[in-house]
Every structure is written in structure tokens, then in C-alpha cells.
Amino acid sequence: MQLYTSAANIPHPDKSHRGGEDGFFLTTPSISSVGIADGVGGWANQNINPKLFADDLMEYTKQSIESGVREPVIALDEAYNMVEQTGSCTAVVGIMERDGLFSVANIGDSGFIVIRQHEILIKSKEQQHGFNFPYQLGKVEGKDGKFYEHGDDRPQDCETYQLKLHEGDIVVFGSDGLFDNIWDNALLEEINSMDCESPEKMANSLAEMAFNEAGRKDNWIPFTERALEQGAWGLKERNDPAFLGGKMDDITVVVAIVV
């Protein structure tokens, strides 16, 4: 079996001049791997392009996998050691073997969902130090020109998953711009309504759906629900009119179909 994949990316309108802050990679079906990284936007306040760290981490992860590494945490660790950029990002990386064994490493608030026979089989969990403070991999440049680990999180802190995929399973990977704006049941309904074998159409449809929800002013989204659950912003009531509206962000979606 192999993963037949396609990606869609819609940058935050205010960040489109630099292509947003997400990075991602796809490999050929014979290698069957996927990765998404979400650059932490706060670095822009220090005149650092957050996308560069995310892009490099994904490129080096792809290179590691293409060289023969088949464990996502090891691939991420090799890539992290190679990055020479100041910045940080969340990341999710998945690899499937020919027998369907699917391994994923996730750090932070990007993630994935597996859909089987029109139902959600599994969804990854976020890793947060606190509300809207996801685990992240980072580095900073020292005065000596070398790059050093930044923050407390490392590839070994990834949440890991392993399961057997079946032919026809659909895996949706996304940055938080997808999962913060789209409820799981709405995502599932959108995928099921398409009933097609085109990951490109599915990825584009989900990205556009998330972007539309992000721009609305009258919706209650998963991100705000988590704020309510965690007591953030002084929020005490669901659908409080003062807190309605989407969360504009970079949106990256990868859809993989098992064939």
C-alpha cells in the first residue's frame, strides 16, 4: 500500500507577502510520508521570518526520510540538528510502510485525523504548555554564529502514534489553522460529501472551508471552545457574543488516501 497525497496552503492575508509561516513536505507514494510545520509568528517581532525555520525543518525531515529513516521522531531529530535558523515551530510527521503500518510524531498543535468507512478512527491530541502555548522546536543563533537549542521542547517530546491503515482510509493532516476553525464533525461531513478519490480536491476544499470560517464574525469555533474549557480570557459562557468569530491564521492541509 501507498499514500496518495496532495496539499493546500492558504496564508494569513497579513502574511501572504512571505508565503505565510507554515512549511510542509510530501514525498512520492513509494516513500509515503508527509509533514507540516507551523512557524511561531512571534519571531516576526524580532525581524525574523518565522517561515524559514519551519521550511528548513520540513526540508531536512524529508531528506532524512528519503535517505532511509522510517521513524518520524528520528527523522525530526536529525532535521532539528541540521537546522541553522533562528525560530521555532510545531510539527507533525507521518510515515506509512507498504504493509499499512502508519507511524506519526506530533509536537504542538498541528495534527492529523484518520477517517475509515466515513467515521473518524483517531485524532491526535494537542500538546500545550498552557492555553495557546504549544510545544515547539526552536533554535537561536549565538554570538559565535552557531545555532543552539531554544526552549524546553525536543523531538523526543513528540506524542507518537502507530496503527495499521487499510486501503481506502483517508488521513487529514493540518496546521492549527485547520483544526482551530473546523469542528471534527464538519470536517468529516465535508470529506464524506465529496466521495471522491482526489486528495487534491479534498485538501483544497478543507483549506477553503477553514479560511471561510476563520473570516466569519458570527461563529463559535473549536479554538474558542478550548479557551472556555481552560478558563482563558475570562470566558464563562459558550456562544458569548463578545467572543464569536473565527481565528485567522495560515492554513495548511494535506490529505492522504491509502491505495
Predicted features along the sequence, with ranges:
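PP2C/PPM-type serine/threonine phosphatase catalytic domain
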Residues: 1-259
